A protein has these predicted regions:
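RNA-contacting regions in translation and RNA-metabolism proteins
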Residues: 1-223
């Protein structure tokens, strides 16, 4: 381990993990066994050098492929991933088989599958698994999880959408330092604007006094 760089000797090849490919806050001690994703191979005079990563989206894809055997059979698949390593990952999944719940398949019984992935990347990194939708408005609404969305209007030409939420959901939709809406935007490919809608005030009619109602009824009968 060198300052800001993790270096791994692999026979004739050398693997390095730059700081940009590391999970923020993660400590790599000498002799520690870790899983990595081979992001690139650079050819040098001394031989090939492997660029390793634990902080990119492909690493999360690899980890789920180890935990979800249905990915190998093609029953379920990861459509898109957006990640800010060490903080949050959003995963859009789908199924090609009717009756198969893709989200439940990736979460696993009692959350065992997603928990195994979180154990590797660090439990401080939240993982949102959402169903992929071909309809952009539906997909955007799903991507805004955990916020509850009222409606979405999409401008296909501008690749922009407005997401309407109730006032109490606005901060959830935006997320800490804009993280939730930022990841949702990357996941869906649309620039997203969050608009809060005030709760509609119900028009309540004044309750009539029961004695007045009885008197009115008596008067009508008398007439």
């Amino acid at each position: 381990v060198e300052p800001r760089v993790v270096r791994v000797e692999l026979g004739k090849a050398t693997g390095i993990m730059p700081q940009s490919e590391q999970i923020p806050g993660e400590y790599y001690g000498v002799g520690r066994r870790i899983k990595v994703y081979i992001k690139d191979i650079e050819r040098e005079g001394r031989g090939p050098q492997l660029i390793l990563s634990r902080g990119n989206e492909e690493f999360v894809h690899y980890l789920f492929s180890q935990e979800v055997p249905e990915m190998e059979t093609g029953a379920v698949e990861i459509k898109k991933i957006a990640r800010e390593a060490g903080r949050r990952t959003k995963l859009a999944v789908s199924s090609v088989l009717p009756g198969v719940d893709p989200v439940g398949t990736f979460v696993g019984g009692h959350g065992t599958r997603v928990q195994a992935v979180m154990n590797e990347i660090g439990e401080q990194e939240k993982v949102d698994i959402i169903p992929y939708e071909d309809n952009p408005a539906d997909f955007i609404a799903n991507a805004m999880s955990p916020a509850e969305v009222l409606s979405v209007t999409v401008d296909e030409e501008a690749k922009r959408a407005t997401v309407y939420v109730s006032e109490d959901q606005q901060s959830v939709a935006i997320g800490r330092a804009g993280q939730n809406v930022r990841l949702a935007s990357r996941l869906t490919g649309y620039e997203l604007d969050i608009e809060a809608k005030a709760a509609a005030k119900s028009e309540t009619k004044p309750r009539k006094n029961i004695e007045d109602s009885l008197m009115n009824a008596v008067e009508e009968v008398a007439e």
